[in-house]
Amino acid sequence: MAVEKVNSSSSLAEVIDRILDKGIVIDAWVRVSLVGIELLSIEARIVIASVETYLRYAEAVGLTSQAAVPSAA
């Protein structure tokens, strides 16, 4: 996949359309500690994409298989 460089300005709608088409993943990790004692730890992975894009890439890495779905029991 080649990176395309465009020198023209983009409208907000074009930027949102491109993000939904290609998708974006944000990994966040926060740890709050006081005097060496961990008080709070937060890990998050945020995926922003259209449903079609998410399903296309999730299927490629095996996230849509039945094994990836947690059981209700």
UniProtKB/Swiss-Prot annotation:
Gene Ontology terms: cellular component:
gas vesicle shell; vesicle membrane
Family annotation (PROSITE patterns) = GAS_VESICLE_A_1, GAS_VESICLE_A_2
Q: Where are its TM segments located?
A: none
Keywords associated with the record: Gas vesicle
Q: How does it assemble?
A: The gas vesicle shell is 2 nm thick and consists of a single layer of this protein. It forms helical ribs nearly perpendicular to the long axis of the vesicle.
- Its biological function? Gas vesicles are hollow, gas filled proteinaceous nanostructures found in some microorganisms. During planktonic growth they allow positioning of the organism at a favorable depth for light or nutrient acquisition. GvpA forms the protein shell.
Q: Which family does it belong to?
A: Belongs to the gas vesicle GvpA family.
Which protein, by its recorded name, is this? Gas vesicle protein A
The scientific name of the source species is Nostoc punctiforme (strain ATCC 29133 / PCC 73102)
Gene name on record?
A: gvpA
